[in-house]
Every structure is written in C-alpha cells, then in structure tokens.
Amino acid sequence: MTKTFRNPQLTKNGELKHLLSIEGLSRDMITHILDTASQFVSLSDSDRDVKKVPLLRGKSVFNLFFENSTRTRTTFEIAAKRLSADVLNLNINASSTSKGESLLDTINNLSAMSADMFVVRHASSGAPYLIAEHVAPHVHVINAGDGRHAHPTQGLLDMYTIRHFKKDFTNLTVAIVGDILHSRVARSDIHALTTLGVPEVRAIGPRTLLPSGLEQMGVRVFHSMEEGLKGVDVVIMLRLQNERMSGALLPSAQEYFKAYGLTPERLALAKPDAIVMHPGPMNRGVEIDSAVADGAQSVILNQVTFGIAVRMAVMGIVAGNND
C-alpha cells in the first residue's frame, strides 16, 4: 500500500493550521493570505484612532526567538497585539534552555501555561516542524526562520510587496542577489515566486554562495551582476550570512561590493521602474549602496510596514483552523 504524504502544516480538510514553509502551499492559499493581509494594511494608517481588531482576544501568543531578531520579532509582537492577543516574549538567554532544558521540555512547560500559538525562530532547520508535531491539537506554530531552511512570513511579505507595486506576477523577471546558499529568505522567495507563476526567477552571486539544484527549481543562475540584472522588474538583495559560513568563502567585504554590490550604475541595467527589496538587516557598502537603499526605487521600508499586515493575516488564518 502506498503511504499518502500529508503536509504537516494543513488540517485534514486542507486548511492552514501551522505556517512552517511556503513549500507545499498552493497558489490559492498564498493568494488568500495576501488578500487577507490587504484588509489589515489600513490598520497601520497613522490617522486611524483604533488600530486593533478582536480576532485573537483571549489568546496567548508566545514569541520564542532562539536567534537574534529585531524586525521579525517586533513585527510579530505588533501583529499579535493588533489582533488583541496577549503576547509573551521569552528571553531565551535567561530561560531554562540556556541551563540545558530541551526544546520540547520548554514547549511542554509553556503549553502548560495555556499557550495558543508559538512563533519560533531557531538556528536548527526543522525545529518548528518538531514543535508542531508535539503541541496539543488547538496550538498553532509559525516558523519565524529556521536555520537555512525557510522564513515563510518574510517570503509572504515579499510577495505582498511585489504585488502591491507590480500587480501581476505572471509577466515579471525577478533577480535574487547575494548569499543564496545560506539564505532561508531566498528559499522561501523562490518557492513563492514560482508558485505564483513568475516566469523568470534569477539567482545572481559567486559560485561559492549559490547552492546546487537551483536550475531544478526553475531558477536561472548568473555569476555576473551586469548580465543578471538586465531587464529585471524586481531586485531582491541579500546580506552575507557570516554567522552561517564556515571557512573563507569570500576575499573581503570590499571585494564583494566591487563584484556584487548594487550600485546606481548596476540598477540602471534593470527596467526603469524596477523596485529594490532587502529583508534586512542591510550592510551598506557591502551588498547595497546607500544611494540605492535610500533611493526612489527602494521599497525596503514598505516591506517592513507590509510585514505587520502579512503576519496579522497568517496568525488570524491559522488560529481559525483546527483538526
């Protein structure tokens, strides 16, 4: 008998219960998340008196960040509070995990405190999957980045940003530039872009920072910025993931900028209305020139703003789905 594979993110009815990866999500499901996010964007308007909705009132959201984060943790906290949830940010360095308690012991103890949702960032690929397998049926898990594997909410907010400025995915050329080998954002973006029907996704970077198998994912590989940026609609820049590198993969930051930094001159090779994105944190003068980061074609701060609405959408959707 053939064993049927079940996506661990989905309920028996195919609804989103956890968000662990963009891989395995349908185009309709991704579009539903983006459409839901658009309903929350107006909550960020500075002239709006009330910025909360009661969708998660009475629910407890635990942010478990085993790696440092500023944007992601903060936007998840804002998103949960705007949904009226009670939010607890666990200080990992001061917690029992730093004293030898296992990951699952930590989860079990927090679950005993009536947790309804865990937002998890962990250095080990697959950690959110492990947690999702062991939580109670009513508890939801959102992956806020696991090792090199995935960063699904970043991928979704990137898709929201692209859709906001470009409308139609099916006639775009998108270039992802930099340290793709170590980037969970790149993996999530590639899965999302190909699922949404983007006809050409390009990866640009030195051979030492590009993983094998990109072509099998439908990605065109370039080792030259000048060649890879020609005629693109969207440029997604990635930082060097020095904390995940072992050994000297590059000569120096200066040499990297010389070969792969996004300058105004290189950006001019893209379409005149191309947009520039970056998941942050940026290393100015390494992968991106300040003139580009702060320029008219940059939508980097828009990504941060849209990230709140996208994370609200994800939390609201998963909270409504149980087996």
Curated annotation (Swiss-Prot):
Its EC number is 2.1.3.2. Pathway: Pyrimidine metabolism; UMP biosynthesis via de novo pathway; (S)-dihydroorotate from bicarbonate: step 2/3. It catalyses: carbamoyl phosphate + L-aspartate = N-carbamoyl-L-aspartate + phosphate + H(+). The keyword Membrane does not apply. L-aspartate binds at K99, R184, R239. It comes from the Bacteria. InterPro entries: Asp/Orn_carbamoyltranf_P-bd, Asp/Orn_carbamoylTrfase, Asp/Orn_carbamoylTrfase_sf, Asp_carbamoyltransf, Asp_carbamoyltransf_Asp/Orn-bd. It holds the Pfam family OTCace. One of its GO terms (biological process) is amino acid metabolic process. It is an enzyme of class 2 (transferase). Catalyzes the condensation of carbamoyl phosphate and aspartate to form carbamoyl aspartate and inorganic phosphate, the committed step in the de novo pyrimidine nucleotide biosynthesis pathway. Belongs to the aspartate/ornithine carbamoyltransferase superfamily. ATCase family. This is Aspartate carbamoyltransferase catalytic subunit. It comes from Cupriavidus taiwanensis (strain DSM 17343 / BCRC 17206 / CCUG 44338 / CIP 107171 / LMG 19424 / R1) (Ralstonia taiwanensis (strain LMG 19424)). The lineage of its organism: Bacteria, Pseudomonadati, Pseudomonadota, Betaproteobacteria, Burkholderiales.
